[in-house]
């Protein structure tokens, strides 16, 4: 009889060790939604370099709280956040300007004008029930003319996320708003 309570205790402890919260993975979506058609002809190439704050450039989703930040162990980005932002921003730019291709580095094609974009996301504010926002600054250089455009702005999504998937969607919206602003800096062909 003495072993029955001990056996129950061992079962409870073992059950606690095997019970585990599942991880959820999120991605950013290019906007507007639709297919990104493969193109072989383009008038301009854009090289894109994006940095995000080291605090949020991690596998786990990070939310803003009133006293700091909260790292969510089981709400995760599918790939490093800097890679997600770079890929999504590139797709967003290409969807807005059909005459450009966004590449991680120059294609070294003589005669195809090159524009270099360096984007630094200074702060990401994401909180359930509040708008998602990014504060960013950028430098856009037309390699042919040497013209440099420098800018800084805050982009906020209109929706107020009620779930972690909504946070990812809100961040996608912020990236799309940034792309909308950046394409104005790309010279016409």
Residue ranges and their predicted role:
Residues 69-76, 144-177:
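Short secondary-structure boundary motifs at beta->alpha junctions and helix caps
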Residues 17-81, 188-189:
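A structural "domain/chain start" motif
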Residues 70-101:
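Mid-chain, structured segments of secreted extracytoplasmic proteins
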Residues 18-29, 36-37, 159-189:
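C-terminal/domain-edge helix-coil "capping" segments
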């Amino acid at each position: 009889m003495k072993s029955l309570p001990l056996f129950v205790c061992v079962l409870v402890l073992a059950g606690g060790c095997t019970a585990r919260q599942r991880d959820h993975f999120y991605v950013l979506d290019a906007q507007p939604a639709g297919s990104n058609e493969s193109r072989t002809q383009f008038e301009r190439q854009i090289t894109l370099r994006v940095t995000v704050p080291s605090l949020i450039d991690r596998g786990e989703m990070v939310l803003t709280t009133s006293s700091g930040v909260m790292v969510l162990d089981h709400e995760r980005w599918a790939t490093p956040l800097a890679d997600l932002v770079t890929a999504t921003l590139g797709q967003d730019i290409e969807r807005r300007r059909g005459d450009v291709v966004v590449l991680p580095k120059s294609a070294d094609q003589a005669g195809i004008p090159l524009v270099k974009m360096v984007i630094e996301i200074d702060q990401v504010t994401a909180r359930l029930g509040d708008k998602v926002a990014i504060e960013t600054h950028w430098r856009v250089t037309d390699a042919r003319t040497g013209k440099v455009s420098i800018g800084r702005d805050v982009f906020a999504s209109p929706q107020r996320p009620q779930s972690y998937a909504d946070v990812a969607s809100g961040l996608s919206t912020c990236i799309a708003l940034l792309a909308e602003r950046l394409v104005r800096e790309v010279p016409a062909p």
